[in-house]
Amino acid sequence: MAVKIRLTRMGSKKKPFYRINVADSRAPRDGRFIETVGTYNPLVTENQVTLKEDRILEWLGNGAQPSDTVRNILSKAGIMQKFHEAKYSKK
């Protein structure tokens, strides 16, 4: 099962709000998911983001692939840097 970390659109028309979910890559965008690991609100001036850092690092360690947008969000939060340091410091 290929697992992705991606955005699920919530909110109403013209007022999007996103949940950052871990889901099977074959599931529809707003369909079945495994776990919610954060939220993203692009309408707030500072792009409000909440993340469960420990769960995201665990999923990345288990092989989950983030989408391009989620990868950018995680990079700005510093989570991708922590993941790469943990992954390559073992060797």
From Swiss-Prot:
One GO CC term, this protein: small ribosomal subunit
Keywords, ordered alphabetically: Ribonucleoprotein, Ribosomal protein
Pfam family, one: Ribosomal_S16
Superkingdom to which the source organism belongs: Bacteria
UniProt-listed GO biological process terms: translation
Gene Ontology MF annotations: structural constituent of ribosome
Cited PANTHER family: 30S RIBOSOMAL PROTEIN S16, SMALL RIBOSOMAL SUBUNIT PROTEIN BS16M
Name assigned to this protein: Small ribosomal subunit protein bS16
